[in-house]
A protein has these predicted regions:
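N-terminal Rossmann-like NAD(P)+-binding domain of SDR-like oxidoreductases, especially those catalyzing
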Residues: 1-170, 284, 297
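Conserved C-terminal active-site "lid" loop/helix of NAD(P)H-dependent oxidoreductases
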Residues: 211, 261-286, 296
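Generic structural signal for alpha-helix termini and adjacent loop/cap motifs
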Residues: 15, 86, 104, 124, ...
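Hydrophobic alpha-helix immediately C-terminal to the catalytic Tyr-X-X-X-Lys motif of short-chain
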Residues: 147, 151, 155, 186, ...
Length: 305
């Protein structure tokens, strides 16, 4: 199969490309490298076609998407803090850029699987959260993700095959600081022999899902016969940010205590995914637990000290 992957030099996109190449698929990668890193593509650099450009460039997108079987749309501006500072640019990239992809995909009759976000639910009291629960985004970034979902709904009614994956807190190798990378930040502090820095009281609850599981959800969505749907991509299990920090400290064997900082504006208090629909319709389920992965990651950090 032939695919375009937008945002392919980023965290999730680069892992997705590796899996597609391993399957024998032909992959074209589009990334403007604003936050993506070309070194993320090093393992597959000789097996892909890389184009440095922007999803807002309609004609470039159109030329790349002609004669492919599908598009994995991972490109986005993702920093919640930056979204308060430059909301117009976030809308332009995340919403207008996505609509370009939907328009062209509809024209060519190809399927799109794209990155949505659990942030569309906002601070909900309904836990675990299902795909049909109320959407109350609390920051400009999350609002752009909800607008993308509304566009998907609109284009699906006009014949586009499109699946939106509402990622919860994805973690794993190559995670960027921009991508809500609390685990990466904590591990970097431990590597320096320093205590993790926790925003606010640390009682924020998170549902962490490994990047390999997110990749599998993308591929299952593309290969499925489902024409239009939204799926939560999480684990049905949660941990507080403070407990996460203490777990990393425990695995490190260092005598440290987390340092608390002021809370961050736009930070959702609790996220927990109900993944029943993804399990039933995609036959998908997460395979990597955060605790097991962290034990290995902290060991790697200690070995590199």
């Amino acid at each position: 199969m032939k695919y375009v992957v937008t945002g392919g030099a980023g965290f999730i996109g680069s892992h997705l490309i590796e899996k597609l190449v391993k399957q024998g698929d032909v992959v074209t990668v589009l990334d403007n490298l604003n936050t993506g890193k070309i070194e993320n593509l090093k393992p597959v650099s000789k097996k892909i076609n890389f184009v440095q450009n922007d999803i807002r460039d309609f004609e470039v997108l159109r030329s790349l998407m002609e004669n492919v079987d599908g598009v994995f749309h991972q490109a986005a501006m993702a920093s919640v803090q930056d979204s308060f500072r430059i909301p117009e640019k976030f809308h332009d990239v995340n919403v207008n850029g996505t609509e370009n992809i939907f328009k062209i995909a509809k024209e060519f009759g190809i399927k799109v699987v794209y990155a949505s976000s659990s942030s569309v639910y906002g601070d909900t009291s309904i836990l675990p959260t299902t795909e049909s629960d109320e959407k109350r985004p609390i920051n400009p970034y999350a609002k752009t993700k909800l607008e993308k979902d509304k566009l998907a709904d609109q284009y699906a009614k006009n014949g586009l095959k499109v699946i939106g994956l509402r990622y919860f807190n994805v973690f794993g190798p190559r995670q960027s600081k921009e991508y809500a990378g609390v685990i990466k930040l904590f591990l970097e502090r431990i590597q320096q022999g320093l205590p993790p820095l926790v925003n606010g009281d640390g009682l924020q609850i998170r549902d962490f899902v490994h990047v390999d599981d997110a990749v599998n959800a993308n591929i299952l969505s593309m290969e499925s016969d489902i024409d239009f749907e939204f799926f939560n991509i999480g684990t049905d299990t949660t941990i507080s940010v403070l407990d996460l920090a203490n777990m990393i400290i425990k695995f490190s064997g260092l005598e440290l205590k987390p340092i608390h900082r002021p809370p961050v504006p736009g930070d959702v208090k609790t996220t927990e995914a109900d993944i029943t629909k993804a399990k039933m319709m995609l036959k998908w389920k997460p395979a990597t637990s955060i605790e097991n992965w962290l034990k290995s990651a902290v060991l790697d950090v200690k070995n590199n000290l």
